[in-house]
Amino acid sequence: VSLSSPTLYPLVSCEGALTDGNLVAMGCLARDFLPSSVTFSWSFKNNSEISSRTVRTFPVVKRGDKYMATSQVLVPSKDVLQGTEEYLVCKVQHSNSNRDLRVSFPVDSELPPNVSVFIPPRDSFSGSGTRKSRLICQATGFSPKQISVSWLRDGQKVESGVLTKPVEAETKGAGPATFSISSMLTITESDWLSQSLYTCRVDHRGIFFDKNVSMSSECSTTPSPGIQVFPIAPSFADTFLSKSARLICLVTDLTTYGSLNISWASHNGKALDTHMNITESHPNATFSAMGEASVCAEDWESGEQFTCTVTHADLPFPLKHTISKSREVAKHPPAVYVLPPAREQLVLRESATVTCLVKGFSPADVFVQWQQRGQPLSSDKYVTSAPAPEPQAPGLYFTHSTLTVTEEDWNSGETFTCVVGHEALPHMVTERTVDKSTGKPTLYNVSLIMSDTASTCY
């Protein structure tokens, strides 16, 4: 009897629009195999197995002198809408050979993105030394969810200072499932005032959607696209140092603020104490506002969801946005290196620059602080770059921080410590210390000074 390996075909549901209440049926057809014994299993793209409780395998059917069989898996549509998976893997074991087949999630409809870029108000630039602010690019209403966002300055791609959030499913009633994504670019005030042209480039299914802005855009008479809401997640530095998580809900393009209300609530609907702050009017005659609330760091780290609700007389219904700590980003701890001042700089007897290089970490949220003789230094004593993607390691980031001290302090043997905080580190924080006598960095136990600022959250 000759053996015949199975040929695999994908099967997808022909039902209507995806909603959070539906199960998406996906299947795998194996045909023309011999002998008749065959085994199906399913996994996600990241190789994690799918529970057999959601898998149904139908009896083998004889077709001519060979056999065929099918397997079905039911996946909650919210996983399809909100997850990062693009396909499932159907795995078929047969005595003649094992075969794998990618079964792509169904695309409810193909819709292009609506791209908007929000420019910074003139009074939003802040910081000691180099003053900075952010451009925000938002793409909404698109499907399918696969999309990428990049930034250009005067036609050249910008690599540093970019923070792009994961794609989110848009919450709405009946109709096709659509998605949104936002990306932020940190810019300096000098670059903005120099009339540099910034471009947010959105790539969706091989088609580019470009939106250009510059300082002259502030004087544009283009009408407002309507009230926009941007929930901003707390940074790791905030949650680690204060033991509380600060939730920010940014509302832009307000024509009036008298009827505005911003509120935060936990996943069970319990209202959180929300402080609302109204900015001054912008050059395009609109306002911005922020609603801030604080929750325990433990609640945020556990993945609990929090919802910002915005009401205003210009809105036909309240706008709601829900955020939670992302669980889909792979965690990788940073490697930390401290470099002493260059000999050529010390010869000048003017100043000494100590550099802290932080490499290979994920997610991108990290903080760097400096200490002298174990005491924290003020942030105006050092400059830390925004995390940037590692050129040779996709998914990982690097940053560097430079501390400038007097040549006298360095030559007198003062110790300088780079303290790095990241959620993937065993104790959330690590440090490296260097001084003139060693000439090389030394690893010490984590200082307790930083924890003195932490408060207990009840």
From Swiss-Prot:
Residues carrying a glycan: N46, N114, N212, N261, N277, N284, N445
Name of the protein in question: Ig mu chain C region secreted form
Organism per entry: Oryctolagus cuniculus (Rabbit)
Keywords: Disulfide bond, Glycoprotein, Immunoglobulin domain, Secreted
Predominant localisation class: secreted
Region named CH3: 223-327
CH1: region residues: 1-106
UniProt entry tagged with the keyword Secreted: yes
Lineage, highest ranks first: Eukaryota, Metazoa, Chordata, Craniata, Vertebrata
Region (CH2) residue spans: 107-222
GO cellular component, one term: extracellular region
Pfam families tied to this protein: C1-set, ig
